[in-house]
Amino acid sequence: MRKIKVAPFMPTEVEVNEISANRAEIVAYPFESGYAVTLAHPLRRLILGSSIGYAPISVKIEGAAHEFDNIRGMHEDVAVFIINLKNIRFKIKDGSDRVELKYSFSGYKEVTAQDLNNDQIEVVNGDLPLATLNEDAELNFTMVIAKGIGYVPSEDLRDEVAPDSIALDAFFTPVRKANYKIEPVLVEDNPNFEKITFDIETDAQIGPVEAFTNALEVMNKQLSVFNGVLDVDISTTLPKRTNDDNELKPFLAAVDALGLSARSFNSLDRAGIKFLGELVLMSENEIKNIKNLGKKSLDETNECLVEHGFGPEFELKENTRANLVKKLEQLKA
């Protein structure tokens, strides 16, 4: 049965699962029905569109008048060289908005992205090929790397680069992928709540969690325009997560998510037991005396406790017990 509400439910849980250095899943729940997509869609767009990255915006190649030219002794023509250059991902070490770099290579050499590393910039995908030179080749070029967001076509950059340089399409965004999925999640016995799972992958210029955090900051700053005029109250009473909250999390698993048989679950549900922690707080005799919990269901319940690390040898610390009792009272109020 639904209760009358005077405010939407505040989500309380956030989980960060780092799959690799460049990929992470960020999970948040529980949201009121419809709220998850309302928040997830604009956040995804901000992750993709507002994440700051670095890209080459121009290159000047000695001996090349335009991008369709050739350089003596270089296997690739200038157009292919430029494509290879645009695929390389950089970081400016001191965080500057722009840096100009000069390079010179000669003689037989397989030039790769890692050959561009120096005191000013770091290449994050150093194994990419750049150019193949023969024994009489000489490759001298100057490029400009800039900080930016999104994508800027070369036509829009021509006024910003030197007249004798070739303007490049600039792919600044460091985010390769930003997806989300929304799933139902049970809160007590109410299935009408939602969980958002963001799947974010970057190119290593920044990490996925940093990209997500930056998007949240941009969203907050964009919305703050209303606060000065409309006196919007953006404060929240949601408490910060404490060590106690983290310590109690294993105890707060819902009974209906423990994989018990229908008979065992129904017996516990009729007894008003909603959380694993309630069973942990009970003695062996108290569990045995749960109404309609037969021997088979009792054995299954005890096995479940053991599987979750709460077997007969488990001892609950007094302060943890007190915190758990208080938390369960709040959840079941």
Swiss-Prot record:
Q: Which Pfam families match?
A: RNA_pol_A_bac (PF01000), RNA_pol_A_CTD (PF03118), RNA_pol_L (PF01193)
Q: Which CDD domains match?
A: RNAP_alpha_NTD
Please quote what the entry notes about the protein's domains. Answer: The N-terminal domain is essential for RNAP assembly and basal transcription, whereas the C-terminal domain is involved in interaction with transcriptional regulators and with upstream promoter elements.
Span list, region Alpha C-terminal domain (alpha-CTD): 247-333
* Source organism per UniProt: Sulfurovum sp. (strain NBC37-1)
Q: According to the UniProt record, where is the region Alpha N-terminal domain (alpha-NTD)?
A: 1-227
Q: Which InterPro entries match?
A: DNA-dir_RNA_pol_insert (IPR011262), DNA-dir_RNA_pol_RpoA/D/Rpb3 (IPR011263), DNA-dir_RpoA (IPR011773), RBP11-like (IPR036603), RNAP_asu_C (IPR011260), RNApol_insert_sf (IPR036643)
The annotated subunit structure for this chain is: Homodimer. The RNAP catalytic core consists of 2 alpha, 1 beta, 1 beta' and 1 omega subunit. When a sigma factor is associated with the core the holoenzyme is formed, which can initiate transcription.
Catalytic activity of the protein: RNA(n) + a ribonucleoside 5'-triphosphate = RNA(n+1) + diphosphate
What's the protein here called? DNA-directed RNA polymerase subunit alpha
**EC number(s) given by UniProt:** 2.7.7.6
Give the domain of life. Bacteria
This molecule's function is given as: DNA-dependent RNA polymerase catalyzes the transcription of DNA into RNA using the four ribonucleoside triphosphates as substrates.
The family this protein is said to belong to = Belongs to the RNA polymerase alpha chain family.
**Mind telling me which SMART domains this protein's record contains?**
RPOLD
| Protein keywords | DNA-directed RNA polymerase, Nucleotidyltransferase, Transcription, Transferase
> Which top EC class applies here?
transferase
Its Gene Ontology cellular component terms are: cytoplasm; DNA-directed RNA polymerase complex
One BP annotation, GO = DNA-templated transcription
